[in-house]
Amino acid sequence: MPYGNKSKDTILRYSRQIIRFLRTREVKAIVIACNTASAYALDTVAAESDIPIIGVINAGARTAVQATRNGKIGVIGTEGTIGSGIYTRVMKQLKPDIQVTGKPCPLFVPLVEEGLLHDSVTDEIASLYLSVLKGKYIDTLVLGCTHY
């Protein structure tokens, strides 16, 4: 179930439920592989836990900052991930003069789930979303959603 359009409270509730379940399996660590759940729930659930819980945003942000040659990075993701501003915050902590352009792409998730990868509608939607990034001269793009 995509979390991108869920409220912060809902995402936190789901994350806590999943972690409780995983704890019954005696896991040694947990990776929150959803960008939106990492953005909205990671800090809280990690603070509540006695086992390591990590997300995907820090690693993705760090890699993008290391990869960019011109300091201009684009991030696409769900409305939740982009709206949280987490990638911009983390990247600017790593390199304060970095320029980050975020673009929510809410229709990418259902298009991927329906397998509409080579469809004219998909091409139109992708062109519309990504047009915001054109002219920004980004040289690095973060795909900030596990769906794409």
Predicted regions and their residues:
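Non-catalytic structural scaffold of enzyme domains
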Residues: 1-148
